[in-house]
Amino acid sequence: MRRRDFARATSGAMFIAAALCTTAMADDVKRVSANGTELAYVEAGQGEPVIFVHGGLQDHRMWAAHLPKFAERYRAIAYSRRNHFPNDASPDGLPDGAADTHGEDLAAFVRALGLSKVRIVAHSSGAHAALFFATRHPDMLVSLALNEPPATGLLAGQPGVADTLKEWGSKQVPAREAAKAGDTQRAIPLFVDVVGGPGAYERRSDADKKMNSDNVASFQADATTKLPRPVFTCEMAKA
Protein backbone atom coordinates (compact mmCIF):
# COMPACT_ATOMS: atom_id res chain seq x y z
CA MET A 1 0.00 0.00 0.00
CA ARG A 2 1.54 3.30 -1.09
CA ARG A 3 1.62 6.39 1.16
CA ARG A 4 -1.46 7.91 -0.54
CA ASP A 5 -3.44 4.69 -0.17
CA PHE A 6 -2.38 4.35 3.46
CA ALA A 7 -3.50 7.91 4.17
CA ARG A 8 -6.85 7.30 2.48
CA ALA A 9 -7.47 4.06 4.36
CA THR A 10 -6.38 5.60 7.64
CA SER A 11 -8.57 8.66 7.15
CA GLY A 12 -11.63 6.50 6.68
CA ALA A 13 -10.76 4.45 9.72
CA MET A 14 -10.30 7.45 11.97
CA PHE A 15 -13.65 9.05 11.23
CA ILE A 16 -15.59 5.99 12.35
CA ALA A 17 -13.26 4.82 15.12
CA ALA A 18 -15.12 6.51 17.96
CA ALA A 19 -18.38 4.87 16.93
CA LEU A 20 -17.06 1.33 16.62
CA CYS A 21 -18.91 -1.68 17.89
CA THR A 22 -16.14 -3.58 19.61
CA THR A 23 -15.88 -7.19 18.58
CA ALA A 24 -13.83 -10.12 19.76
CA MET A 25 -10.55 -10.47 17.92
CA ALA A 26 -9.33 -13.73 16.50
CA ASP A 27 -5.78 -13.14 17.71
CA ASP A 28 -4.93 -13.92 21.31
CA VAL A 29 -4.00 -11.05 23.58
CA LYS A 30 -0.24 -10.86 24.05
CA ARG A 31 1.74 -8.98 26.67
CA VAL A 32 5.10 -7.29 26.76
CA SER A 33 7.07 -5.38 29.41
CA ALA A 34 7.71 -1.76 28.46
CA ASN A 35 8.84 1.26 30.47
CA GLY A 36 8.33 -0.48 33.81
CA THR A 37 4.83 -1.78 33.11
CA GLU A 38 3.12 -4.59 31.21
CA LEU A 39 1.15 -3.70 28.10
CA ALA A 40 -1.39 -5.96 26.41
CA TYR A 41 -1.70 -6.00 22.64
CA VAL A 42 -3.16 -7.87 19.69
CA GLU A 43 -1.80 -8.09 16.18
CA ALA A 44 -2.62 -9.43 12.76
CA GLY A 45 -0.85 -9.62 9.42
CA GLN A 46 2.74 -9.30 8.32
CA GLY A 47 4.87 -6.60 6.78
CA GLU A 48 5.52 -2.98 7.68
CA PRO A 49 4.30 -2.33 11.25
CA VAL A 50 1.38 -0.01 12.00
CA ILE A 51 0.60 0.66 15.65
CA PHE A 52 -2.89 1.76 16.68
CA VAL A 53 -3.27 3.91 19.81
CA HIS A 54 -6.69 4.23 21.47
CA GLY A 55 -8.27 7.15 23.30
CA GLY A 56 -9.80 7.57 26.74
CA LEU A 57 -12.30 5.05 28.15
CA GLN A 58 -11.04 2.69 25.44
CA ASP A 59 -8.45 -0.04 24.89
CA HIS A 60 -7.10 -2.19 22.07
CA ARG A 61 -10.64 -3.41 21.33
CA MET A 62 -11.43 -0.03 19.80
CA TRP A 63 -9.54 -1.10 16.68
CA ALA A 64 -11.00 -4.61 16.35
CA ALA A 65 -12.99 -3.81 13.20
CA HIS A 66 -10.02 -2.19 11.48
CA LEU A 67 -7.14 -4.61 12.02
CA PRO A 68 -8.27 -7.30 9.55
CA LYS A 69 -8.29 -4.85 6.64
CA PHE A 70 -4.93 -3.32 7.52
CA ALA A 71 -3.54 -6.83 8.11
CA GLU A 72 -3.93 -7.54 4.40
CA ARG A 73 -0.82 -5.41 3.77
CA TYR A 74 0.64 -4.52 7.15
CA ARG A 75 1.55 -5.95 10.51
CA ALA A 76 -1.31 -4.25 12.35
CA ILE A 77 -0.78 -3.90 16.10
CA ALA A 78 -3.25 -2.45 18.63
CA TYR A 79 -2.17 -2.14 22.26
CA SER A 80 -3.80 -1.04 25.49
CA ARG A 81 -2.10 1.93 27.11
CA ARG A 82 -0.94 1.92 30.70
CA ASN A 83 -3.78 1.85 33.26
CA HIS A 84 -6.24 0.60 30.63
CA PHE A 85 -7.93 -2.81 30.29
CA PRO A 86 -6.75 -5.56 30.36
CA ASN A 87 -3.61 -4.14 31.95
CA ASP A 88 -3.45 -3.54 35.69
CA ALA A 89 -5.60 -0.48 36.35
CA SER A 90 -6.32 1.71 39.36
CA PRO A 91 -7.84 5.16 40.04
CA ASP A 92 -4.49 5.90 41.68
CA GLY A 93 -2.61 4.95 38.52
CA LEU A 94 -1.47 6.95 35.52
CA PRO A 95 -4.09 9.45 34.28
CA ASP A 96 -5.38 9.06 30.75
CA GLY A 97 -4.22 12.61 30.02
CA ALA A 98 -0.57 12.01 31.00
CA ALA A 99 0.37 12.25 27.33
CA ASP A 100 4.11 12.59 27.89
CA THR A 101 4.37 9.34 29.87
CA HIS A 102 2.02 7.52 27.50
CA GLY A 103 4.27 8.72 24.67
CA GLU A 104 7.32 7.23 26.37
CA ASP A 105 5.39 4.01 26.95
CA LEU A 106 4.71 3.90 23.21
CA ALA A 107 8.40 4.27 22.42
CA ALA A 108 9.26 1.52 24.89
CA PHE A 109 6.52 -0.67 23.41
CA VAL A 110 8.00 -0.25 19.93
CA ARG A 111 11.45 -1.21 21.20
CA ALA A 112 10.07 -4.16 23.19
CA LEU A 113 8.61 -5.57 19.98
CA GLY A 114 12.02 -5.31 18.35
CA LEU A 115 10.85 -2.68 15.88
CA SER A 116 12.86 0.29 14.65
CA LYS A 117 10.44 2.38 12.56
CA VAL A 118 6.65 2.33 12.66
CA ARG A 119 3.55 4.03 11.34
CA ILE A 120 1.24 5.37 14.05
CA VAL A 121 -2.55 5.71 13.89
CA ALA A 122 -3.95 7.33 17.02
CA HIS A 123 -7.19 8.69 18.44
CA SER A 124 -8.04 11.39 21.02
CA SER A 125 -5.83 11.24 24.14
CA GLY A 126 -3.87 8.51 22.41
CA ALA A 127 -3.22 10.96 19.57
CA HIS A 128 -1.95 13.50 22.10
CA ALA A 129 0.47 10.87 23.41
CA ALA A 130 1.53 10.10 19.84
CA LEU A 131 2.51 13.75 19.35
CA PHE A 132 4.91 13.54 22.29
CA PHE A 133 6.25 10.27 20.89
CA ALA A 134 6.77 11.80 17.46
CA THR A 135 8.62 14.82 18.82
CA ARG A 136 10.86 12.88 21.18
CA HIS A 137 11.50 9.90 18.92
CA PRO A 138 11.36 11.13 15.30
CA ASP A 139 13.84 8.46 14.25
CA MET A 140 11.24 5.78 15.11
CA LEU A 141 8.44 7.31 13.04
CA VAL A 142 7.50 6.64 9.42
CA SER A 143 4.11 8.39 9.41
CA LEU A 144 1.57 9.78 11.84
CA ALA A 145 -2.24 9.79 11.40
CA LEU A 146 -4.14 11.52 14.21
CA ASN A 147 -7.82 12.01 15.00
CA GLU A 148 -8.95 14.64 17.53
CA PRO A 149 -5.79 15.05 19.62
CA PRO A 150 -6.62 17.35 22.58
CA ALA A 151 -3.46 19.34 21.88
CA THR A 152 -4.90 22.67 22.94
CA GLY A 153 -1.40 24.07 23.42
CA LEU A 154 -1.16 24.39 19.64
CA LEU A 155 -3.90 27.04 19.81
CA ALA A 156 -2.26 29.18 22.48
CA GLY A 157 -2.62 32.89 21.81
CA GLN A 158 -5.31 32.52 19.17
CA PRO A 159 -8.36 34.81 19.51
CA GLY A 160 -11.17 33.33 21.57
CA VAL A 161 -9.30 30.16 22.49
CA ALA A 162 -9.05 30.92 26.21
CA ASP A 163 -12.81 31.46 26.51
CA THR A 164 -13.55 28.34 24.47
CA LEU A 165 -11.29 26.20 26.64
CA LYS A 166 -12.83 27.63 29.79
CA GLU A 167 -16.31 26.76 28.51
CA TRP A 168 -15.15 23.27 27.52
CA GLY A 169 -13.65 22.73 30.95
CA SER A 170 -16.82 23.82 32.72
CA LYS A 171 -18.85 21.28 30.72
CA GLN A 172 -16.64 18.50 32.03
CA VAL A 173 -17.00 19.43 35.71
CA PRO A 174 -20.09 17.25 36.45
CA ALA A 175 -18.41 14.15 34.97
CA ARG A 176 -15.18 14.78 36.82
CA GLU A 177 -16.94 15.41 40.11
CA ALA A 178 -18.86 12.17 39.71
CA ALA A 179 -15.60 10.35 38.98
CA LYS A 180 -13.97 11.84 42.07
CA ALA A 181 -16.90 10.63 44.16
CA GLY A 182 -16.55 7.13 42.71
CA ASP A 183 -19.89 7.33 40.92
CA THR A 184 -18.55 5.86 37.69
CA GLN A 185 -21.97 4.81 36.38
CA ARG A 186 -22.88 8.48 36.28
CA ALA A 187 -19.47 9.83 35.29
CA ILE A 188 -19.10 7.84 32.08
CA PRO A 189 -22.39 8.90 30.40
CA LEU A 190 -21.83 12.50 31.45
CA PHE A 191 -18.37 12.58 29.89
CA VAL A 192 -19.37 10.76 26.70
CA ASP A 193 -22.28 13.16 26.17
CA VAL A 194 -19.96 16.15 26.58
CA VAL A 195 -17.57 14.78 23.96
CA GLY A 196 -20.11 13.28 21.56
CA GLY A 197 -23.15 15.46 22.17
CA PRO A 198 -26.44 14.81 23.99
CA GLY A 199 -27.50 11.17 23.83
CA ALA A 200 -24.11 9.95 22.58
CA TYR A 201 -23.72 7.42 25.38
CA GLU A 202 -27.14 5.86 24.88
CA ARG A 203 -26.43 5.42 21.18
CA ARG A 204 -23.36 3.33 21.92
CA SER A 205 -23.49 -0.43 21.65
CA ASP A 206 -23.46 -2.59 24.76
CA ALA A 207 -19.95 -3.69 23.83
CA ASP A 208 -18.73 -0.09 23.66
CA LYS A 209 -20.40 0.72 26.98
CA LYS A 210 -18.64 -2.24 28.55
CA MET A 211 -15.32 -1.08 27.13
CA ASN A 212 -15.95 2.37 28.63
CA SER A 213 -16.71 0.82 32.00
CA ASP A 214 -13.65 -1.43 31.82
CA ASN A 215 -11.45 1.65 31.39
CA VAL A 216 -12.90 4.05 33.93
CA ALA A 217 -9.87 3.82 36.26
CA SER A 218 -7.71 6.06 34.08
CA PHE A 219 -10.56 8.57 33.82
CA GLN A 220 -10.86 8.62 37.61
CA ALA A 221 -7.10 9.14 37.80
CA ASP A 222 -7.49 12.09 35.44
CA ALA A 223 -10.19 13.59 37.63
CA THR A 224 -8.23 13.29 40.87
CA THR A 225 -4.64 13.91 39.83
CA LYS A 226 -2.76 16.90 41.21
CA LEU A 227 -0.21 16.75 38.43
CA PRO A 228 -0.31 19.38 35.66
CA ARG A 229 -1.57 18.17 32.31
CA PRO A 230 1.23 17.94 29.72
CA VAL A 231 1.05 20.63 27.05
CA PHE A 232 2.15 20.05 23.47
CA THR A 233 3.23 23.37 21.98
CA CYS A 234 3.90 24.82 18.56
CA GLU A 235 7.58 25.00 19.47
CA MET A 236 7.59 21.25 20.10
CA ALA A 237 5.85 20.64 16.78
CA LYS A 238 8.50 22.66 14.95
CA ALA A 239 11.41 20.82 16.56
PLM ranges: what are they?
Residues 153-208, 223-226:
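Helix-rich cap/lid subdomain of alpha/beta-hydrolase
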Residues 31-35, 58, 222-230:
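Short gly/ser/thr-rich secondary-structure transition/capping motifs
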Residues 207-239:
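Conserved serine/cysteine hydrolase catalytic core
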Residues 116-155:
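Conserved hydrolase catalytic core segment
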Residues 1-50, 73-74:
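Alpha/beta-hydrolase fold catalytic core
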Residues 77-121, 125:
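Active-site loop/oxyanion-hole signature of alpha/beta-hydrolase fold enzymes
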